Amino acid sequence: MYIELVKYPDVFLRSDSKTVPFPLDDKTQRLIKYMSRAMYQHHGIGLAAIQVGYQLRMFVMDVNRSEEKPQVFINPEIIKKSKESITDFEGCLSAPGKRGEVKRYIRITLKYQDEKGEEIVKTFYNLAARCIQHEMDHLEGKLCIDYEKGNYSRDKHKSQTMVESDFRTKSDS
């Protein structure tokens, strides 16, 4: 079964994502598996819930593309960033054929919950750190193509119509 992603310029991608309540219900557990399948099917290394139509603060990641079991990040928060950063081009599964030049920290420390609700604090480097920052942007309604010469452009972001709602899904729109 082919999994369709929400694609730019759909304004749903500009939505802020909502906190995921614990314990996870069956629907959310199925959504995590669905997100993983979608990420692998589209040959990505990360995928946020908003990209499959859910305004939830979670994403999956597998920078090694092992296709075994991706890491699951629920209610993530970056709590520490390195001073060092690097600017590079990024693509996005929700914006095929488009790329943005994005400045990212090379090391971040992330606080998040796993599928059991356990709080985890872990430091990530290089590609994993870049991927996490990219997916975190999705949770805030930002896309890599919103960056101008490596820096986030508020004007470019504001030019998109923002969607306000509580915990809605793409199918509710």
What is each model feature region?
Residues 1-173:
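Positively charged
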